[in-house]
Regions:
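Serine-hydrolase catalytic machinery in alpha/beta-hydrolase-like enzymes
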Residues: 1-52, 56
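Short beta-to-alpha linker loops that shape the active-site pocket of alpha/beta-hydrolase fold enzymes
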Residues: 4-7, 89, 144
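Primarily recognizes the serine-hydrolase "nucleophile elbow" in alpha/beta-hydrolase
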Residues: 55-102
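Short, proline-enriched alpha-helix->beta-strand connector loops that line the catalytic pocket
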Residues: 101-106, 134-135
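C-terminal catalytic histidine-bearing segment of alpha/beta-hydrolase fold enzymes
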Residues: 123-166
């Protein structure tokens, strides 16, 4: 799985799809659309190179990666199989609700002690999906900060096995 394309300004050892620091919601949305195009290009390249259909593609991400995979996965006209999201949020619910083109399988997971992306973001995403008649799987990890616990990796693998026909 590829890393995001940019070095992270807030955490030099990490990567980012775009800079979230000191940005207005409009700037974040604009930058997320550029990142979405990059991810769509990658998905299309992987599909072509490996002779895959979209329903053979599962995308996922942590934190900002979750944000981009949710936005991209729901907006693609050729539905990817699934989206796995850890510790993220929906970047712009109004934009996303107006641009939904597909209904992939979705699981969202979040730590209850996350101080980087608040648990409120998880609850807002869960509410968004409910309002838009999505049936999604969710998991809140107790005593978990901004990370993917071992249980989260296991749940992600179980989700893939459940939804991916091999």
């Amino acid at each position: 799985c590829p890393d995001a394309p940019e070095k992270c300004a807030a955490s030099p050892s990490g990567f980012q799809w775009f800079d979230l620091m000191d940005q207005t919601p409009e700037q974040v949305l604009a930058k997320s659309l550029v990142a979405e195009n990059k991810l769509n290009k990658l998905i299309d390249e992987v599909k072509e190179k490996n002779n895959l259909s979209a329903d053979q593609i599962i995308i996922g991400g942590f934190s900002q990666g979750c944000m981009i995979t949710l936005q991209t996965g729901l907006k693609r006209k050729d539905k990817v199989n699934s989206v796995i999201g850890y510790s993220g949020r929906i970047i712009d619910t109004e934009h996303l609700s107006k641009n939904i083109n597909s209904r992939p399988n979705i699981i969202l997971m979040h730590g209850d002690l996350d101080q980087v992306v608040s648990i409120d973001s998880f609850l807002e995403a869960k509410e968004f999906f409910g309002k838009n008649n999505y049936e999604i799987e969710t998991k809140i990890f107790k005593n978990c900060e901004h990370r993917i616990p071992t249980e989260g990796s296991s749940l992600g693998l179980q989700f893939i096995k459940k939804h991916f026909n091999t």
